[in-house]
A protein has these predicted regions:
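Long, terminal "pre-/pro-" and other extracytoplasmic accessory regions
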Residues: 19-181
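Sec-dependent bacterial lipoprotein signal peptides
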Residues: 1-17
């Protein structure tokens, strides 16, 4: 009996890790059956379903092309980046030309009503923290949301301008902003 238990133990440990109990910072962020590594292959509906299953607070990027498109045409690309705080509420950032809009949506895949960023003074978000830190806002801003940690840990997002030379680090847990020289 003990021999059987020891034979099954590695498989059991592997199962626990695959369910998000692995605390390794370099592990792929898992939400149900969808890993962030395979995110580009899943649809919005699939990801939404998996996020509901996971019930974890995670950052993710909702558009699949980033570096190449920014390098090709940084001024005319509309970027939509979502910060999912839980399964029922998210904040959506829309970057279009010189304008930045924020919407608060119950479902990230539904279109929200754009609100001018400058008219919002109470929203506790990374971009508001960015303004409070007196860091100059580039005319076109893009967010890179990294996924290289477990659901219990949120990797910081990096916001930078269209020239891709000026980085700002946004702590995913606290919202604190600091510039990377």
């Amino acid at each position: 009996m003990k021999k059987v238990i020891f034979m099954l133990l590695p498989a059991f440990v592997s199962l626990l890790c695959s369910c998000g109990f692995n605390n390794n910072d370099n592990a792929g962020l898992k939400s149900g059956a969808v890993t962030i590594d395979s995110f580009l292959e899943v649809t919005k509906a699939d990801l939404a379903t998996e996020l509901k299953k996971s019930n974890k607070a995670v950052f993710y990027e909702s558009m699949i092309t980033f570096v190449n498109t920014v390098d090709e045409d940084p001024g005319n690309i509309e970027r939509v980046t979502n910060i999912v705080q839980d399964t029922s509420m998210c904040i959506q950032f829309v970057h279009q030309g010189d304008n930045t809009y924020i919407t608060k949506n119950p479902s990230w895949w539904l279109k929200g009503l754009p609100i001018n960023l400058d008219s919002i003074i109470s929203l506790d978000s990374a971009i508001i923290r960015l303004q409070q830190a007196n860091i100059q806002k580039p005319k076109s801003r893009y967010c890179v949301l990294r996924y290289d940690s477990c659901p219990t840990q949120i990797t910081p997002a990096y916001i930078f301008g269209p020239d891709s030379t000026r980085f700002v680090r946004v702590d995913g847990l606290t919202g604190d902003v600091s510039e990377i020289k």
